[in-house]
Amino acid sequence: AKQVVEQYHLLENRYLNVESKKKFSVSMQHYSFAVKAFVQLAKEVGMDEYEFAVHETKTKEVIDNVKNLKSELGVLYLSDFNEKVLRKLFKECDIEFKELFTCNTYVYLWKKHPLAGKKVITLDDLQEYPCLTFEQGVNNSFYYAEEMMSTYEYKRVIKADDRATMLNLMVGLNGFTLCSGIISEDLNGDDYAAIPLKESEIMHIGYIK
């Protein structure tokens, strides 16, 4: 996540190097790499003069928090599937999206999962295991999903509100989720693996402001 940290530093120069600015908040989808970059930024800038806030939350709330100035920045992703809808919403909210990087889709699961030894996983391989997705509340449109392939008809789906619960479900039920593959072992631990999905789609991860 070196590139993410570098981007945070650029944002730090813009938002924090102003004497009258005493608060800095970031809202984000459930990305451990973004939390890690935020932690590094807070340590390097120092927490004596600034009040930091990080909100790991639902997609619509990320957008609303930036729109309503609760957060200076929001971290989320665009794909071929959701880009048209979300960019329309960004325009309505008078916010803009800046891409940080692109990545393929990975299957994230427990290292003792029956599929953990595979070099590549297919959607057919995953049919007998529960797909874990983040709950989006009343805005439960496929376009707000934090996971790729949100319209695919999985046999079993479990929704969760936070990363800790999702990690527990991976261990307890051999669940999986689809992600960017950029994982922070410092935060999630080293008991999990990210394996390429054969039917991968491109994720455009960036920030809104």
Model-predicted regions and their roles:
Residues 18, 89-131:
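Flexible hinge/capping segments at coil-to-helix
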Residues 34-37, 83, 123, 127-152:
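Secondary-structure junction motif
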Residues 23-29, 74, 108, 132, ...:
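Short, well-ordered beta-strand segments
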Residues 13-65:
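N-terminal winged-helix
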Residues 111, 193-209:
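A late-sequence structural motif
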Residues 39-41, 60-105, 109, 192-194:
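Short beta-strand-centered segments that line the small-molecule binding cleft or hinge
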Residues 1-17:
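Alpha-helical "hinge/linker" immediately C-terminal to small N-terminal DNA-binding modules
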Residues 67-72, 136-193:
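Hydrophobic hinge/microswitch elements
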